[in-house]
Amino acid sequence: LPSEKAPGSQNGFDNSGRKGPIAWQQGNTVTQTVDAFRALAERYLSESDVVAAIEALNEPNIPGGVSEAGLRDYYNQIVDVVRQINPDTSVFLSDGFLSTEAWNGFKTGDDVVMDTHHYVMFDNHLISLDINGHVKSTCDFGKQIKGSDKPVVVGEWTGAVTDCTKHLNGKDVPTRYQGEYANNPKYGDCGDRSQGSVADLSDQERTNTRRFIEAQLDAYEGKNGWLFWTWKTEGAPGWDMQDLLANGVFPSPLTDRKFPNQCA
């Protein structure tokens, strides 16, 4: 069960409920968040056959200005709340856009799980890579998370390698991939990547997407697992797991690999 939004915005992203400056940790916003979290936990954590874990807060943005010390204090409060309500529930802690190893020694052995999100389209270097580069980068990331002293779940990832999906960067915000965003260089044309089905992509692009997905499965299962983002969307090639499965681009069963041992 994720906690996507906090008063004031914990990351400045539109999916926090408010796009713009980060104001979480100002005034009484942390207290409000703890109170809201407690109400959520009291409502759902008794349903242990449904909710096995709960996240303290989605994507607090430390590089963007969230205080790391303040976030650690908030995490301590949240773990205490969960232990009071249902001590058998695991608590997911976002890495705050730091490396998972940066959290070594914090709450280790206290039934907490590090949650890291891995996207390539928001990074100017990663978005420029070809499929071989994406596979190598993914496998390198899989090796990196093994350095954590706690369980690590890659709680968000996708099959897309560009930011071409409509409104991905925000409503009516242009793309990095086509060189329209913040003076980025142009890496290519979006074409059919903006909306629709993965079936509309070329055979080569579908093959590359399958290869990228399989590399991520190998990398993330080398630690403690993953959650794909997302199960169903309104026409976003690479992001829609139902669509990927229906078109043979996501392995089914998961052991059905066309590109085995890419991270060996």
Predicted regions and their residues:
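Acidic carboxylate-rich catalytic motifs and surrounding loops in phosphoryl-/glycosyl-chemistry enzymes
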Residues: S3, I54, L93-F97, N224-G235
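Extracellular glycoside hydrolase catalytic/binding regions
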Residues: S46, A52, E59-E214
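Aromatic- and acidic-residue-enriched segments that line the glycan-binding/catalytic groove
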Residues: A6-Q25, L168-G179, L244
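Eukaryotic short linear interaction motifs
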Residues: P7-G17, T29-Q32, V50, T100-E101, ...
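Aromatic-rich peripheral "rim/lid" segments of glycoside hydrolase catalytic domains that contact
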Residues: G191-A264
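An active-site-proximal structural segment forming one wall of the substrate-binding cleft
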Residues: L1-A6, N15-A53, V81
